[in-house]
């Protein structure tokens, strides 16, 4: 399903709706930037939670993110703490270097992936592994079977014609 949204705020709310986010889901954003998708997801789950025990579990166990840039990681961590996430499950590392099998185990099993990967990082054969499609494949391999994902990519990412792009799309 392809949906356009005019600004990031609307996309954050839209992502929650597209994946039919439930208070039992475990959210993962591997390119979390400032944490906007995680915060939107957390708030939606907290509103749907039945009691304080569920709300506490959501905050402490069900929100996970990775950000590679130190500056953005600092902002994301601050944003999550200011919004009362309880225990910031964010790490400052390279998502593509993470083992998808280990990521699947976070919080009891990642059921929802949100992602706005860095654009236009693949400039040639040496950096083909940095394409938006490679990020999508790695995300899909990192969520549990039956999980859902919402991803923002430029249209050009979906019409890539290189052999590498075609192979990744086939894999996805």
Where are these regions (language model features)?
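Generic detector of intrinsically disordered, low-complexity, polar/charged segments
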Residues: 4, 30-33, 144
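Conserved S-adenosyl-L-methionine
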Residues: 10-112, 120-122, 126-129, 133-134, ...
């Amino acid at each position: 399903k392809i949906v356009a949204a005019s600004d990031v705020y609307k996309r954050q709310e839209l992502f929650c709706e597209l994946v039919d986010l439930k208070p039992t889901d475990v959210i993962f954003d591997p390119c979390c930037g400032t944490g906007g998708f995680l915060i939107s997801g957390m708030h939606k789950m907290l509103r749907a939670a039945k009691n304080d025990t569920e709300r506490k579990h959501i905050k402490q166990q069900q929100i996970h993110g990775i950000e590679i840039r130190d500056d953005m990681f600092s902002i994301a961590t601050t944003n999550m703490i200011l919004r009362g996430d309880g225990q910031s499950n964010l790490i400052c590392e390279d998502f593509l270097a993470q083992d998808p099998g280990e990521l699947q185990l976070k919080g009891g099993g990642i059921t929802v992936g949100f992602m706005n990967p860095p654009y236009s990082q693949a400039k040639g054969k040496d950096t083909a592994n940095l394409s938006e499609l490679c990020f999508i494949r790695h995300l899909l391999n990192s969520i549990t079977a039956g999980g859902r994902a919402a991803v923002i990519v430029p249209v050009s990412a979906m019409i890539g014609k290189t052999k590498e792009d075609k192979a990744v799309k086939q894999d996805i």
